[in-house]
């Protein structure tokens, strides 16, 4: 069963309240500060990480933060070195890790298909489902937002897929209007080569619709540094990773064109700024001289 927008709307970015803690599952929610602290210690132990421009992150209020996407490391570097809670779009499967395990358990060719292990299947189902649900709820509690990345490919229904993405976009706008900081990687996927790819207009579009600032950032040095080969060769240890946060573009500086054209124009400008930030981190977020006023 695939996640739909109604499910996201009810299970989305939850803030624990006294009423919610009456639910048994909520008792197992881990405060975001704990994994954030532990992950930060690990990252600083392994890598040489430098952050600049942190003062550009607004203390409160909705905003979109964007970056180039070079490696799995990009998300934890951004998430743990920025003080504010960040909302992330993440594939549905990450929130339901039990599905692959249960599929293996139910496979007729697995060891669990015959006694004595088959007698344990009910207990395994219960335990795995509980653990998977708890893990998924914690990811949401920490800022994860489950989405289906290829809804058209799954549903084979273009109309339904378009409806899903339109509703998802509406939901992202609602998140921003509620005051959250939403992270989007405009390339849409990680770069296999480390070379920044063309930006999609989603980040600009939701920022325009929500009327919130958009913060360009750039990361360098992380490409391939989470791969086993980087650790085996020693390249990962104390590798220099720089995450540079640029000056936000406020809504009043957005293009005044119709929405679709404005999103295209803003995306082109953001692509230039992110490229500059990842290439010239030593400038510490100083404005790029040839960037035009939007």
Task: Describe each region flagged by the PLM.
Residues 34-42, 135-138, 172:
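Hydrophobic alpha-helical segments of integral membrane proteins
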Residues 61-157:
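Catalytic core of membrane glycerolipid acyltransferases/transacylases, capturing the structured
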Residues 37, 49-54, 74-75, 131-132, ...:
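A generic local structural motif
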Residues 39-69:
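Helix-to-loop junction immediately C-terminal to a conserved catalytic motif
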């Amino acid at each position: 069963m695939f996640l739909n927008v109604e499910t996201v709307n009810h299970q989305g970015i939850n803030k624990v309240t006294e009423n919610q803690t009456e639910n048994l599952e909520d008792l197992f929610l881990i405060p975001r500060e704990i994994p954030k602290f532990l992950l930060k210690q690990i990252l600083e132990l392994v890598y040489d990480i430098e952050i600049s421009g942190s003062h550009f992150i607004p203390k409160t209020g909705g905003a979109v933060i964007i970056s180039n996407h070079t490696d799995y490391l990009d998300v934890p570097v951004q998430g743990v070195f920025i003080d504010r809670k960040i909302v992330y779009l993440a594939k549905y499967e990450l929130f339901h890790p039990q599905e692959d395990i249960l599929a293996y358990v139910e496979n007729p060719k697995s060891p669990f298909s015959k006694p004595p292990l088959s007698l344990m299947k009910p207990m395994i189902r219960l335990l795995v489902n509980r653990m998977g649900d708890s893990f998924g709820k914690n990811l949401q509690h920490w800022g994860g937002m489950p989405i289906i990345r290829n809804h058209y490919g799954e549903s084979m229904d273009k109309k339904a897929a378009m409806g899903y993405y339109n509703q998802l976009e509406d939901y992202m706008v609602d998140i921003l209007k509620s005051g959250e900081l939403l992270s989007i990687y405009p390339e849409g996927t990680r770069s296999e080569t480390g070379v920044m790819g063309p930006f999609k207009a989603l980040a600009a579009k939701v920022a325009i619709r929500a009327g919130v600032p958009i913060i360009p950032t750039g990361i360098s040095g992380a490409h391939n540094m989470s791969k086993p080969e980087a650790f085996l060769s020693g390249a990962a240890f104390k590798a220099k990773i720089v995450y540079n946060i640029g000056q936000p573009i406020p809504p009043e500086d957005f293009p005044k064109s119709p929405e679709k054209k404005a999103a295209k124009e803003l995306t082109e400008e953001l692509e230039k700024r992110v490229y500059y930030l990842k290439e010239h981190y030593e400038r510490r977020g100083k404005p790029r001289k040839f960037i035009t006023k939007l």
